[in-house]
Amino acid sequence: AVPAGTLSPLQMESLREVCEVNVACDEMADTAGIVAAYTXFYGPVP
């Protein structure tokens, strides 16, 4: 997985767009952060 500090704002926005359509992922992002939520539901950040 890619450490959160190495993602550009555009990459972070892309993760949010994927995650927000999944209610469970979106809720996890609110508490654990978008990178943690994305990796838990979709695997390593591309």
UniProtKB/Swiss-Prot annotation:
Gamma-carboxyglutamate residues are formed by vitamin K dependent carboxylation by GGCX. These residues are essential for the binding of calcium. Ca(2+) 2 binds at E17, E20. GO terms for molecular function: calcium ion binding; hormone activity; hydroxyapatite binding; structural constituent of bone. Residues 1-43 form the Gla domain. GO terms for cellular component: extracellular region. The modification Phosphothreonine is found at T6. This is Osteocalcin 2. It comes from Solea senegalensis. The gene is bglap2.
